[in-house]
Design a protein with these regions (language model features):
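Conserved ATP-driven motor cores of ASCE-family P-loop NTPases powering translocation/secretion/packaging/pilus
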Residues: 377-479
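P-loop NTPase motor domains
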Residues: 67-385, 400, 405, 468-489, ...
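Conserved long hydrophobic alpha-helices within structured protein cores
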Residues: 47, 53, 328-335, 429
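A broad, low-specificity signal for short, low-complexity segments enriched in glycine/proline
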Residues: 35-42, 55-68, 274-280, 319-321, ...
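Short loop or secondary-structure boundary microenvironments that flank
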Residues: 319, 323, 363, 391, ...
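Basic- and hydrophobic-enriched, low-structure N-terminal and domain-boundary segments
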Residues: 1-84, 88-91, 125-136, 446, ...
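A short glycine-/small-residue-rich loop at the edge of a beta-strand within enzyme catalytic domains
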Residues: 37-40, 328, 364, 420
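Short alpha-helical interface patches
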Residues: 1-51, 170-180, 227-230, 451-482
């Protein structure tokens, strides 16, 4: 009895004292590929309600799943070298889902041509019970997307975009100046931000004057350029006043505390020679607006950026993949878009837009820098906005956003690698995938007077995919990593299997979207333009009917 209890107690003590922590079969790493079970909680049973990522994996559009632990933001980082299929395997499949509004960067303008007809057909109109509405003929009624296009390759095939149309207060003026400075080049001395600060003062003053004092049809970049051109400076005569000086003198008489006047007075502290240098830098920065086509395309606005989240809209930014001259206009539009949608969500819709807005930013490194993108990526999620950054290599993001690159990538809950050989990208994915534990079996033979044989079993760690394996990955395969989920090695999405594929021009050339024809059917109303009104009496109408 007692002796047995002592022995048992002693055995337990000795075992505990000599206890070791074992992790069987994961000694060198627990990495493994994801399975259907891993992705199931993150996908909607209805395929049309998902973001398409691979042939077998997706992400539910609902931001509030039944289990809050399964909530993920919809920001996606897509990396793939040239020819890896970023458009075919990611952008077009997601446009075919048609569950959101879309803002698409479209290099060369081919995506709009290929999917435009599908979007103009739209989605079935639903009643309050979520069932399709049918017309008198029994056919389902469809609601077409509102298609907008801003074309920096051919301005004659573009709608108008006027950044001034979205200025509503002094804060908006400062935002516009910030994005203008960030995406255009002046002629200041390298490494000295004095010139940038001086230009900022002048732009803020002039744009403030235009917004508060000019008629609506003159609130555009054309007026800004004319004001810069009218600002003659005489180095030998500090008392000389140019036409713009006289405008601000008159403004001071009317409102001594005017926002624009306060900024202009700060600019005027510069001496004649310095002021002249500032104007030269401003002239260089605004040089694109001296081009007649650019001045005309920014004369008034048709894009309605603030309404993209109110109704299903598809906005296409067509950019050149070889010439970045006018890409700053697209960056400016993206910056205004994010700010406008966030403000509209907060001010009008209680924090969430009625229609989710997905920004599919192809060639994200080529449109220029979007100021504060690292902060926007973290805050847009709650407003029903998401951004998909599509790049050829991660190093492109580093070159554009410097130390903020990691923050931007960290705010993308999903990362998709379609293939490539850029070293930074390969090393990043190699590290992300981790190591697995494998079994190694060695045999040995020792020959001599007596031959002996040996066997050795041991475990070691191996990269789930090494750098060289990543570089030669099958062109039909891709890698997907979703936050908190095992990585997936899957097939790229087969676009021909999508139920809406038959409406693309890929399926039938007759489905090609005619941009010129679409734009010609619109009758744009320009600010300040007068239109004649005609009245027809009932007698005249009756006479016309019987004639």
């Amino acid at each position: 009895g007692l002796g047995g209890a002592v022995i048992v107690r002693l055995a337990v003590y000795l075992k505990g004292k000599d206890a070791k922590k074992y992790r069987k079969n994961v000694e060198y790493g627990s990495a493994r590929w994801g399975s259907k079970t891993d992705i199931a909680p993150f996908m909607d049973p209805k395929p049309e309600n998902n973001i398409i990522l691979t042939q077998s994996e997706g992400l539910m559009m609902s931001g509030r799943p039944k289990n809050p632990a399964n909530a993920r933001n919809k920001n996606v980082l897509v990396v793939g070298g040239s020819g890896s299929g970023k458009t075919r395997f990611f952008i077009k499949p997601n446009l075919m889902q048609m569950h959101s509004s879309y803002v698409v960067t479209d290099p060369k303008g081919t995506v709009l041509i290929e999917v435009g007809k599908l979007l103009s057909r739209g989605t079935p109109k639903l009643d309050k019970d979520g069932k399709p509405v049918r017309g008198k003929n029994g056919k389902i009624v469809y609601e077409p997307y509102k298609i907008k296009v801003f074309n920096t390759i051919n301005f004659s095939k573009s709608m108008h975009y006027n950044p001034f149309a979205y200025i509503h207060n002094e804060k908006d003026i400062l935002k516009l100046v910030t994005v203008l400075i960030a995406n255009t080049k002046g002629e200041g001395k390298s490494g000295d931000d004095f010139w940038v600060k001086a230009e900022t003062l002048l732009y803020t003053a002039l744009i403030g004057y235009i917004y508060y004092e000019a008629p609506s049809n003159e609130q555009n970049f054309s007026t800004l350029v004319e004001m810069i051109n009218a600002m003659e400076v005489r180095e030998d005569d500090e008392t000389f006043k140019n036409a713009v000086d006289l405008l601000f003198d008159a403004l001071e008489q009317k409102d001594p505390d005017h926002f624009a006047l306060r900024q202009y007075k700060k600019y005027k502290l510069a001496a004649g020679k310095t002021a002249k240098s500032i104007l030269i830098s401003c002239g260089a920065r605004l040089a694109p607006f001296d081009i007649k086509e650019v001045r005309e395309i920014t004369m008034y606005d048709e894009l309605e950026l603030d309404l993209v989240g109110d109704r299903k809209t598809a906005l296409f930014f067509i950019i050149s993949d070889t010439d970045a001259t006018f890409n700053f206009l697209v960056s400016m539009a993206y910056t205004q878009l994010f700010n406008l949608l966030c403000e509209r969500a907060d001010d009008k819709f209680g924090g969430r837009l009625p229609v989710h807005v997905r920004c599919l930013i192809d060639e994200a490194a080529n449109i220029g820098q979007i100021p504060n993108l690292e902060k926007l990526m973290a805050t847009i999620r709650s407003r029903e906005i998401s951004a998909c950054l599509v790049l050829q290599a991660q190093s492109q993001l580093k070159a554009l956003y410097k130390d903020n690159m990691d923050t931007i990538i960290g705010n993308c809950d999903s990362s998709l690698f379609l293939g490539g050989k850029e070293e930074t990208t390969l090393k990043s994915w190699n590290s992300l995938l981790g190591k697995e534990t494998i079994d190694m079996y060695n045999t040995s033979v020792t020959k001599g007077t007596q031959e002996s044989h040996g066997q050795n079993f041991q475990k070691l760690g191996k990269d789930l995919m090494s750098v060289d394996e990543l570089a030669v990955m099958d062109g039909g395969k891709c890698l997907l990593q979703i936050r908190g989920v095992r990585p997936f090695l899957s097939r790229k999405y087969d676009i021909t299997k999508h139920p809406n594929y038959k409406y693309l021009s890929d399926f039938d050339e007759k489905n090609a979207f005619d941009i010129e024809k679409y734009l010609s059917t619109r009758l744009p109303v320009r600010p300040g333009e007068l239109y004649p009104n005609y009245e027809i009496t009932p007698e005249e109408l009756a006479a016309q009917t019987t004639a």
